């Protein structure tokens, strides 16, 4: 059974909204500045506003796994909103919302997805906090890198309820998850060789 996740990321930059928009809308360039975006491959072009575009995106992570999915842009309201759907190892919706308060641009990203990787779903009851921590690491790094690209300051990253997991818990959880996956693979391989 797929495990559902809902994430909210908020970035605040001392930069103009149009400059922030121009970087976010061009996801094909994300691998140039966002450490955890391994590749973005255009499958279908969109219109002049990128509406309808389809891309295959592969993410690396702070943990030893990758996730890939196709992402289609379903709604664009320049420079305020980009919505899309994901299909693949993650399935669901994502929404970038940009707003401006004085000289500050606020970026909110809502990511509501379920996982289709069986090992992730199997381990979710014990590893969910680790997966959530990993997501936050990816997004925090994205915010910092975007600020550098903008020559701006990332003013803060408000923390989600699952955000600041102590490092020891992450290490213990990752070790436990790795041991479980290793054991599962051993059993599967052993059964397959009979």
Where does each model-flagged region fall?
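Hydrophobic ligand-binding cavity/cleft-lining segments
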Residues: 1-50, 176, 180-194
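Well-ordered beta-strand positions in beta-sheet-rich domains
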Residues: 8-12, 68-70, 93-95, 110
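A short, polar/proline- and glycine-enriched secondary-structure boundary/capping micro-motif
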Residues: 67, 93-97, 117-123
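Signature tryptophan residues that serve as conserved aromatic anchors
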Residues: 21, 30-34, 59, 96, ...
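Acidic, low-complexity intrinsically disordered regions
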Residues: 7, 17, 26-30, 55, ...
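Glycine-rich portal/gate segments that line the openings of hydrophobic small-molecule binding cavities
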Residues: 32, 41-93, 101-106, 141-156, ...
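Terminal "cap-and-tail" regions of soluble proteins that handle hydrophobic small molecules
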Residues: 2-3, 13, 101-194
């Amino acid at each position: 059974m797929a495990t559902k996740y809902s994430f909210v990321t908020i970035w605040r930059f001392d930069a103009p909204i149009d400059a922030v928009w121009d970087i976010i809308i061009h996801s094909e360039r994300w691998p140039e500045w966002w450490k955890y975006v391994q590749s973005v491959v255009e499958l279908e072009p969109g219109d002049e506003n990128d509406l309808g575009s389809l891309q295959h995106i592969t993410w690396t992570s702070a943990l030893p796994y990758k996730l890939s999915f196709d992402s289609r842009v379903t709604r664009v309201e320049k420079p305020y909103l980009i919505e899309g759907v994901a299909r693949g190892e993650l399935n669901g919706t994502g929404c970038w919302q940009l707003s401006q308060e004085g000289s500050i641009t606020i970026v909110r990203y809502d990511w509501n997805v379920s996982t289709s990787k069986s090992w992730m779903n199997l381990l979710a009851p014990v590893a969910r906090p680790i997966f959530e921590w990993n997501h936050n690491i990816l997004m925090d790094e994205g915010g910092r890198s975007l600020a550098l690209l903008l020559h701006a300051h990332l003013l803060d990253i408000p923390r989600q309820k699952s955000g600041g997991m102590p490092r020891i818990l992450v290490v213990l959880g990752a070790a436990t998850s790795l041991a479980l996956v290793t054991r599962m693979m051993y059993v599967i391989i052993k059964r397959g060789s009979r």
